[in-house]
Amino acid sequence: MKKLLLLFISFVAFCSCENEEFDFAAPVDVQSEVAVDSFYVSFDEALAQAEKALAGTTTTRASVVKRKVANHHEFVASRSTRATGDGVEVRFHVINFEDNQGFALVSADSRTTPVYAYSETGNLDIEDATENTGFGDFMDAATEYYIAETEWTGPENPLLPNDPNNPTLPITPVPTNPILQLPTVELDGERYYLDYREVVSQNSAGRIVPVIWGQGWPYNFYCGSLGVEDDYLGNRCAVGCGPLAVGQVLSVYRYPIFIDGKIFNWNKIMLSNSYNEAYTDGAICSEGAMATAYMLKAIGVNMNANYGYETSVTIDSMIMTLRNLNYNFAANEYSYTNMINSLNSNYPVIICGYDGYGLFGGHAWVVDSHRKVDKFETYYHSYEPYDVAFRNEVIGERYFHCLWGDSDLIHSWCLDVFEYFNSYNNKLIIYNIRPLHHG
């Protein structure tokens, strides 16, 4: 991966949850259509990267959690036709694991970051997922970032031990000195022993929000008739991204217990902590799902939601509802520092993208965790006393866990590519969200 320093220009938005169309070419036949390319990442290589990401650590193969592949295909983002003068193709591996044990979206170009998105649960249908407003915006930014990585002309990372092009020189290891057990690399004509380590870390609480809900059936049970039948919504209006985002944040604290005279039964609500638990054959709703649907409708009414196929609220009304619910928070233009500090304090974040403040035409969802990979390289002289020659700390991957709350893709970890997020003119975060009595 190139040493691209990223600014996390948030990728969350809200208001009317309008969908930006993002087209992909049909899945390709890997054997017949993949051109011979020195940068091409094979399926086996992509699978290894996927397993590392899903294991939550990249330090040793022993720590990798094994999953069985259910299916795999490649797709090419159609916008790649305008990518570069060299005709860079934006190609990804989509790897799904059996028993809904997760998926990974892995780059097929070795010049880029290996894993762009992954989840420990569920599977990814790329065409359905990009109908999700938030994930579609993410894929738009990911495509731009992918192209930028292939065009990067800055300094290369030093060749690492597992790089087949590494000019490793044979040595005779001396068991009594652990440095001599390290692999060797050659840089600028000098040979060094290299100690390379990757450390994965995230906010102390891990995922902050204990629920995974959606805008469709059964959570939209009380949202009124849609007038037509929809595969995702049933015959009901959508919950709305604003009410859903706020509702999921409330679940962290199980507070308040009522709004506008509507009482929330948190014991029942928390029984419906996952979309799969609540959704049974598109018809039968659990008691927990009904309690959740009741709460989400009450929140939407307080926001003056405009119910329909794309239920909408304003940013002003969303902020006012949080105040009505006796919550403390801050709301400002996007700041990476504020985002990370909020998550490190175990306070969830709602990120909003919009074209005009208080107007319809945006989107919102929740970010409830961050994960990063720090990479450390220590180079030792290849001669006695084998002291440290120099050290490098390489900026690695940064991921954010997003509760999309829409379509079949409810949540996933996504690469920080938001320097390239241009779907909206403005980006705002609501952060440090907690009840007033919480301090």
Give, region by region, the residue ranges found by the protein language model:
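Active-site-adjacent substructure of cysteine-protease-like catalytic cores
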Residues: T81-Q101, N328-G396
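Structural recognition of the beta-strand scaffold that forms the well-ordered cores
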Residues: V94-I95, L105, G240-S251, M295-A298, ...
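Exposed beta-strand-loop-beta-strand "reactive/processing" segments of non-cytosolic proteins
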Residues: A62-S110
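Bacterial Sec-dependent N-terminal signal peptides
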Residues: L5, F11-D37
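Active-site-adjacent structural segments surrounding the nucleophilic cysteine of cysteine proteases
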Residues: T121-G308
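Catalytic Cys-His active-site segments of thiol-dependent hydrolases/isopeptidases
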Residues: S107-A108, T113-N123, S369, V373-L415
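Short Lys/Arg-enriched alpha/beta "domain-start" segment
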Residues: A35-K66
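Low-complexity, Gly/Ser/Thr/Pro-rich intrinsically disordered linker/tail segments
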Residues: R398, V417-G439
